[in-house]
Swiss-Prot record:
The gene is SG1. This is Esterase SG1. The keyword Mitochondrion does not apply. It comes from Schizaphis graminum. Keywords: Disulfide bond, Glycoprotein, Hydrolase, Serine esterase, Signal. Gene3D superfamilies: alpha/beta hydrolase.
């Protein structure tokens, strides 16, 4: 391939990535700027998606068995085009193989309209999906927006929360307090309440 073809190909690829990055939907939440993407419902309706948004700090190391801590602000723009990891637990569909990570307190937001398209009189309802799994397994991304937002106009949010031992083990004292997975859910709901109009 000649150098001229390589240069033209390089500029073409650069233009494609630059155009798609500048076309990304952007919002600002309390922790910083977020750039999302697009998805399509079953009937082909285009919706905005913001995936893998942290609603609390990662519950790792000294915070492993503690209640969720506030998310720290980030510099730059958060890439919200990739779902955050599911929380660590068994995958019942693959012979109880352990899946997920400890750094898992993320949520996903799907909406047919961005806030700048809404007037105060045109705000949408918010539906939050908290996955099941007997507090042992599951992930927020398991029920996507493809059907729910096909003809409905509301903001749809899914969350991850700690499951199993990391979310619900307790020693009955302050060393290992109970129900951190439930406290994760409350932290996610508070984050949604404070940031969803972004």
């Amino acid at each position: 391939m000649s150098n001229t073809c390589r240069i033209v190909l390089f500029y073409l690829i650069t233009c494609i990535f630059t155009c798609s990055a500048s076309d990304a939907p952007k919002v600002r939440v309390n922790s910083g700027d977020i750039a999302g993407g697009y998805e399509y419902t079953y009937s082909g309706r285009k919706i905005y998606s913001f995936l893998g948004i942290p609603y609390a700090s990662p519950p790792v190391q000294n915070y492993r068995f503690k209640e969720p801590q506030p998310v720290k602000p980030w510099l730059g723009t958060w890439n919200a085009t990739i779902p955050g990891s599911s929380c660590m637990g068994p995958d019942y569909e693959s012979n109880f193989k352990l899946v997920g990570q400890e750094d898992c307190l993320y949520l996903n937001v799907y909406t047919p309209k961005l806030p700048r398209e809404n007037t105060p009189d045109d705000l949408m309802d918010v539906v939050v999906h908290i996955h099941g799994g007997a507090f042992m397994s599951g992930e927020g991304i398991s029920l996507g927006p493809q059907y729910l937002l096909d003809i409905n106009n509301f903001v749809y949010v899914t969350i991850n929360y700690r499951v199993g031992v990391l979310g619900f083990a307790t020693t009955g004292d302050n060393i290992l307090p109970a129900n951190n997975g439930m406290k994760d859910q409350v932290a996610a709901l508070k984050w949604i309440q404070q940031n969803i109009v972004a």
